[in-house]
Amino acid sequence: MNNKDLKTKFIFITGGVVSSLGKGITAASIGQILKNRGLKVSIQKLDPYINVDPGTMSPYQHGEVFVTDDGAETDLDLGHYERFLDENMSKKSNVTAGQIYQSVINKEREGKYLGKTVQVIPHITEEIKQKLTDAALFHKSDVVIVEIGGTVGDIESSPFLEAIRQVRFDFGYRNVLYLHTTLVPYLKKTKEIKTKPTQHSFKELRALGIQPQILVLRSEVPINQETKNKISALCDINSQAIFEALDVDILYQMILNLNHQGIDDFILQHFKLTNFPTADLQAWQQLITRIQNLEKKVVIALVGKYIVLHDAYLSIVEALKHASYQYNCKLEIKWIDAEKVTSDNISSFFEDCDGILVPYGFGNRAIEGKILAINYARTNNIPFFGICLGMQLAVIEYARNVLHLQDANSLEVDEKTPHPVITKKIVDINLGGTLRLGSYSCHLKANTKSKAIYNQEIIYERHRHRFEMNPHYVSLFEKNNDFVVSGINPEQNLCEIVELKSHPWFIAVQFHPEFLSRPLKPHPLFKGFVEASLLN
C-alpha cells in the first residue's frame, strides 16, 4: 500500500461492552460537525460478517438494506451517514468480511500471490487496508471516519482490528485517531455509575495494540468529572478526551451534544489541523427546537410484512419524520401486519388513519392483505403512498377491481396468472446480484401530480427490485383517463410512477424515495404525502 500521496486523516470507531451502542450515530454526528467546519468527510462501515453484502439477509435479522446511488446493498448505518452528512455514500463505503475473503480467494486462484501461503496476516489485513485507502481516494476525503462493526472481543472482528492497528504505523500517529465507545451502566437502585465494564473493554483493546485517544461513554445519566477522572486514571487516557453520549429522544441532538463538549476541537488538535472555522449548527438547533414544539399530529398506517422489527423500514420512518417536522406535526405510525388484514376487519385498522403507506417486500406472503389496504385507500379517498412492491400491488388492485381483469397478478406471486400486469425484467441466476439496483433517471409527464410535486422534468431515484409493471398493459390502464403512468425511465421505457387523477392523493413509485430524504431537506414525495394526510 503506497501511502506517500495520501493526505487523508482516519478516525477509527470501535465499540465495547455491548452491541448496538450507537457507533453509527456517533460517527455520523462527528462527520456532520467536521463537515460543518469545512472538511470533506466520508464515512466507511467495516462489517465482520461473512455475507458479501446484506442483500439476501432477512430483514428480521439485519433491518433494512440501504441502497446507494451506485447500486450497493449496504448496512442501514449508511442511511444514518447520508442523512446526517447530506453526502452520498458509495459501494466503497461498506466493506464486509465476505467481500474481503472473496477478493483474497479470487486473487489466490488467479495466482496473484505467486504460490505463497495465504494467511490472515498479511493477506487479509492488507486487503482491508487497501479498501480503506480506496475509499479515501474515491471520495477525495480530508477525513475518513471508519466504524468497525461488532464489539471488541468478537472473534470475527480480529482481522479488522489488526488491520486498523497497522494503519497508524503505515500513516503516522498524527494521521490516525482511535475512538472507543462503551456503555457505562447506571444502577438506579444505588444511583451508581459502574465503570468496570469500560475498564475491561479498554484493556482488551489495548491488548490488541490499539490505544484510543478518545473515549465516548454511552449513558442514561450525565457523567460527573469525578467518574471521568477515575476512568482516566485506570485507562491511561486524558480526562479531557472522555466525552459522554447521553440517551437522547431526538437523534440529531447528538450533533449538538458532542459539539458542545468540544470533541471536534480535540480531533482537529490531534490531527494538527488549524484555521478551520467553528461549526455553525444553527439549522440543526432550529430543527430540534421545532421537533420539541410540534403542535399537530398525523397518523400514518404502515402496512407491512416485517413490522416486528421496525428497523426493516428505518429509512421510510425517517423520511416520514422529516416531512412531518416540516409541517409542524408529530408523526404517529400505526404498524399494521398485512397478514392480519381481511375484508371483514379492514375498517378497524384504518378508520383513525390520515394516510396509508404500503412499502416494499419480497415473496407472496401478506400480499392480499396489502391489496385490501390499497383498495380501502382508493375507495375511501384516503391519501395513499406505495413504494416498490407497494406500487406493483396498486397496479394489481386497480387491474382486478377497476379494469375487472380477473386473477390479475404479479409473476412473482403467480406464474400462471392470466393477466401478468407485473412482470420480471431480470432473469434469475441466484438471489444475490439479480436486482435492478442504484440510481436511474425518470421522466415526469406534464400536468400530473408527480410533476407538480417534484417541479422538474427529469429526476433520479434509487431502485431495488426484480419486477416491473408490464408495459403491454399500460395503454389498457390509461384508457379510462384516470390511471396515469406519470413517470417513465426513458432508457428502457419502464414504468416508475403511477397515480390516479380522481383521487385526492394516490401515488405509487417503483423506486425508493426514502433513501434520498434528509432531515433538513425532506423528500418532495414524502412532503406531499404528509401534507395530503393532514388535509384528510
Swiss-Prot record:
Its EC number is 6.3.4.2. It catalyses: UTP + L-glutamine + ATP + H2O = CTP + L-glutamate + ADP + phosphate + 2 H(+); L-glutamine + H2O = L-glutamate + NH4(+); UTP + NH4(+) + ATP = CTP + ADP + phosphate + 2 H(+). Gene3D superfamilies: 3.40.50.880, P-loop containing nucleotide triphosphate hydrolases. Mg(2+) binds at residues 77, 147. GO terms for cellular component: cytosol. Residues 306-536 form the Glutamine amidotransferase type-1 domain. Pathway: Pyrimidine metabolism; CTP biosynthesis via de novo pathway; CTP from UDP: step 2/2. CTP binds at residues 19, 154-156, 194-199, 230. Keywords: ATP-binding, Glutamine amidotransferase, Ligase, Magnesium, Metal-binding, Nucleotide-binding, Pyrimidine biosynthesis. UTP binds at residues 19, 194-199, 230. Signal peptide: none annotated. InterPro entries: Class_I_gatase-like, CTP_synthase, CTP_synthase_N, GATASE, GATase1_CTP_Synthase, P-loop_NTPase. ATP binds at residues 20-25, 77. Transmembrane segments: none annotated. It is an enzyme of class 6 (ligase). Allosterically activated by GTP, when glutamine is the substrate; GTP has no effect on the reaction when ammonia is the substrate. The allosteric effector GTP functions by stabilizing the protein conformation that binds the tetrahedral intermediate(s) formed during glutamine hydrolysis. Inhibited by the product CTP, via allosteric rather than competitive inhibition. CTPSs have evolved a hybrid strategy for distinguishing between UTP and CTP. The overlapping regions of the product feedback inhibitory and substrate sites recognize a common feature in both compounds, the triphosphate moiety. To differentiate isosteric substrate and product pyrimidine rings, an additional pocket far from the expected kinase/ligase catalytic site, specifically recognizes the cytosine and ribose portions of the product inhibitor. Catalyzes the ATP-dependent amination of UTP to CTP with either L-glutamine or ammonia as the source of nitrogen. Regulates intracellular CTP levels through interactions with the four ribonucleotide triphosphates. Belongs to the CTP synthase family. Homotetramer. This is CTP synthase.
